[in-house]
Amino acid sequence: VIPVWILDEVVEGHGACPKWRLGLAVSHFADVLADKGSRLTLRRGKAVEVLCGLVRETGAGAVYWTRLYDPESVERDTAVKAALKGDGIEARSFAGHVLFEPWTVETKTGGFYKVYTPFWKSLKDSAVPAALPAPTTLRAPDTWPDSDRIEDWDMGAAMQRGAEIVLPFVNVGEAAAQGRLGAFIGEGISGYEAARDRPAANGTSKLSENLTHGEISARTCWHAGMRALHEGKQGAETFLKELVWREFGYHLVYHTPVITTGNWREEWDAFPWNTEDTPQVTAWKQGRTGVEFVDAAMREMYVTGHMHNRARMIVASYLTKHLLSHWKIGQQWFADCLIDWDAASNALGWQWSAGSGPDATPYFRVFNPLTQLDKFDRDRAYVDRWIAEGRARPHRDALAYFQAVPRAWGLSPQDRYPEPVVDVAEGRQRALSAYENR
């Protein structure tokens, strides 16, 4: 068996933080294989050309891989399979990234699901196969093919000085992911339903980065959640619902791939969203809108590569509604800054917030970041952790933000905290007027 990983055209297009985090995952996986007496062969180039070349070099008779469902990956995998089969090579892909293949889940009329709740109800009692255990050893070939060095790829180049800031918040590898899952099921899941909406609480599983990079299987998480449910642990069903929300994203991106690039609801194509990097958009990206909940969330993402889910909803609503800026601006910024970036989940989340997606929040639901702060961060622990300006003794994580951002931004913790770029009440009314007149 010759394990191979290819830095191909799809991965080359990843944003700074996801690409860097993927490099960590690949490097760690290479170490795991080495411990099993194997090697990870690294190549760079177009997947179909690299694989066909490796087959010729090694005399391999079969190529196997795990399926993905975003449009670019589907196109790539289709081309690879056709080329290999054309050369008489067995080419097979397998389902390992999701609980159910998107085409196996159908409505009663044979279509695909467009609303989450019936999608959840159709799956919650379905049998999910258990994840296969990792092999203890892999039979090595007589001769190993040449391999690139991952250090030469410099997958973290675009991170600049931010990499050393984000690194302590990363949890790399299967063993670490399994440990995180075990701790969550054993200690955290009972309080999950209540704590998951409070960004200052350590109330979520934090498994999203590991799921994204294949370091733990959704099936493994599902079976752990089901065991917790059968043991009567409060919060277990909510955890399972979140896994199915991830599944819903893949279901939609497969059946309607436009969701990653354009409005899922075509009637939103004429909506007058701003599409430029205006000063207000720049303030949003930099966490300097003058709205503490929004700014804390954006800074959390820049320092840790994570953002709490409640905070994601608030910053997305603020950008698309209070600032009337296109959701694709936010989608692209998240794609550059998140270590758990996932094309399907990212697109679904942004279009849900903007109102342009399937099962989206109604246009008149405009999150008020001030009342959200009172509700979910009443003691201000979250904003105090991430905002340094005006604090006599700023939290170290708030100060880390100024060490992580590009020097060209010219930011300092001694700066005055900015005034709001838009009045919250006026921004809400402007959004409602625009939606009602669209």
Name each model feature, range by range.
Residues I6-D8, G45, L68-D70, G96-H97, ...:
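An acidic- and aromatic-residue-enriched active-site/binding cleft used to recognize and process polar
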Residues V1-A131, G235, S345, S433-R438:
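Trp/Phe/Arg-rich N-terminal binding region typifying the photolyase-homology
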Residues I89, G110-W268, F376-D377, A381-R438:
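Glycine/tryptophan-enriched, flexible segments
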Residues R21, A25, G173, T289, ...:
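Soluble or luminal CAZymes and related metallo-dependent hydrolases
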Residues N202-A392:
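Active-site-proximal binding-pocket segments
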